[in-house]
Amino acid sequence: MRKPCNWRAPFVARTDMNASGNYLKKGFSLSALTQAVMLSGMMALGAASAHAADVAEESVQPAIKSDLAAHTLLVDAAVAGDRLVAVGSRGHIVYSDDQGKTWTQANVPVRQLLTAVYFADDKNGWAVGHDSLILHTSDAGANWEMQYRDPELDQPIDPEGPSLLERPLMDVWFKNANTGFAIGAYGTFLRTDDGGKTWEDRSYDIDNPDGFHYNAITAVKGAGLMLAGEMGTLYRSPDFGDTWETLTDLPYDGSWFGASGTSSDNVVLVWGLRGNMFRSTDFGDTWEQVELLTPNNGPLEATLLGGGLSGDGKLVVVGAGGVVLSSTDGGNSFDVMTRPDRI
């Protein structure tokens, strides 16, 4: 039976199109990237407060087909060859073969909120979400199957006991079509080495005694993986997921909501609350704050949510209130704008 616990931080919408080295995703235009990640305004998700008791009573049901699926809340997007694939609320997954001009709804076996999507190659992709769901596609996102669901949801729950909370997964990353990782609430860290046929709980591989949430995982070119979470926690893996080191000289103690490598070796950026963004050129040994100014030359104070690296090396980060940041110099500096429809 699951141990009761309280939420410490809200789960936030994010987009992750970052990768590195041999894992770099195929390029796409900046306009298509912006359109994909800004669908439905990219609003932050509210604090997740669904009780596991309520969730357990709901059978797994397929997502409802709707002509409006592409206009609902979509919180992450990825590239599968020349196709864009976006995931979001109510189990909605949509894909576009014309750089975001039109969208088609995929066949999805669940209705829960999906928080992240990642493709290891042109065909094989994984999406994660609430109820610790992990979905897989082998046809570039047109059809999906469920590979994993939190096994504790199927355990009997004492109706007289305290309310229990679910553990959503917040991000997913794959080294290749076989080895990948899914991360999420309360220090959840899952690993597969068979393309998701089986998933092993490897949360004990990371030193996280307080069970802080993990929000983002990204590859850093020429270096390894970076894992970012709440309370300023950062972890790195120089062997791409086999071993993990806790970073102790942290630049900030608020929650991180996103992370991205760049096209340069050892360079990684992380971002979070109130416009806080930091950049490291040595895989996390040292950090420098990135100065972000609004068009009026005031400090940016919007919470930064998701971001991605395009095929041409341009880095885009989006935030609350329609804020869009773009960098063409590997994250040294950013142009800041606010979407006109959000002003």
What are these regions (language model features)?
Residues 8, 13-17, 36-39, 45, ...:
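N-terminal processing/targeting junctions
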Residues 37, 51-343:
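Residue-level hotspots at or immediately adjacent to binding/recognition sites across diverse folds
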Residues 18-49:
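Gram-negative bacterial Sec-dependent N-terminal signal peptides
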Residues 1-28:
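N-terminal secretory signal peptides that target proteins for export/translocation
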